[in-house]
Amino acid sequence: MKVAIIHDWLNGMRGGEKVLEAILELFPHATIYTLFHERGKVSPFIESHRIVASWLQSIPGVYRHYRNLLPLFPAAIESWDLREFDLVISSSHAVAKGVRAQGALHICYCHTPMRYVWDAEDDYALGALRHAAFRAVRPRLQRWDCEAAARVDHFIANSRFVQERIREYYGRSAEVVHPPIDTHYFTPPALNQREDFYLAAGALVSYKRFDIVVQAFNANHRRLVVAGDGPDLQRLRRMATRNIDVRGWVTSEELRRLYRTARGLVFAAREDFGMVAVEAQACGCPVIAYGAGGSLETVQDGVNGILFAEQHPDDVIRAIHRFELQAWPLEQVRFRTETFSRESFKTRIKKFVEERQNQNQERRGLRLQPA
């Protein structure tokens, strides 16, 4: 069986790329198709596969300014000839689901309907497309996105929150399979001795609202480490007072050490799932999170963290005060993390694909050869 995996772009190792790795473990001979591929920015495991980039790869400056090329993404994602493949799996938070599968069974693992065009154009770092140029093309991109969703045979959502967004924007049903967390790597320390600092971690983009976390810690004077890279890095450094270390990008080993030693993780995003929160919990680190989106599926108030109601510095400060009044036993913080394990993800994805393949074979009256 020939398998193609479509991924929006490859320019860093974030949550979507961790999902891609796990899917590739299930389909080790798959070919990856992507809008553009910045070599050396993803894991050696991903790099070891055959990777086909679109014609966007040849545009000068694409790695730095790709968000400004959003109106070109639909044409690029539709440009491949995939007739040789039996199964197409798209890993999509933008346009990957719009690939033309040309008769193959197409399953989309949807990280989110495209934020750029549906509900967060003012929150995401889109460069020049924030302004009139983007507003002019937005209705056309919304129409294309709905047409692209109709090409998908079956949707998988990464959370119940995204499942509802798929229903709202595309009128499609989806099965929920939460993203994979490496619970063999993200483990608690031998001695659970927390240090006197808080952690905020992830991609430093505006919709994740690191700014309100920094503002809260500017006001309450507690120590904060901000770990991650992205377009907001320098802005956050300018905002931060001396008690805040905006560290930038850290290795996975350093991130794990921070999870293992931080007093708590502060998570202010209205996130589709939020893998960072579960990684922290797996290391025994409780989470102080905005009570919306995927956090409602991973943080149980008073058990493995604290939820706050508004994305405002004052709400963060009040949540930290509540947090500090409570003890956080290690096993209580970790009690659900194994349900998000990499093994659980792969088992559920494999079962979903096999069931849909069997249904497809029955409809066609054909029997596909196993890989």
Sequence positions of predicted segments:
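Conserved acidic donor-binding segment of nucleotide-sugar-dependent glycosyltransferases
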Residues: 301-302, 306-312, 320-327
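Acidic donor-binding loop of glycosyltransferase active sites
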Residues: 260-272, 285
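Membrane-proximal helix-turn-helix segments that form the acceptor-binding/catalytic region
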Residues: 126-155, 163-164
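Short hydrophobic beta-strand element within catalytic cores of glycosyltransferases
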Residues: 286-290, 299
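A charged, aromatic-enriched C-terminal amphipathic alpha-helix characteristic of glycosyltransferases
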Residues: 314, 325-367
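Nucleotide-activated donor-binding/catalytic signature segment of Leloir-type glycosyltransferases, i.e.
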Residues: 234-254
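Active-site donor-binding segments of glycosyltransferases and PAPS-dependent sulfotransferases
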Residues: 26-97
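Conserved donor-binding/catalytic core segment of Leloir-type glycosyltransferases
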Residues: 187-225
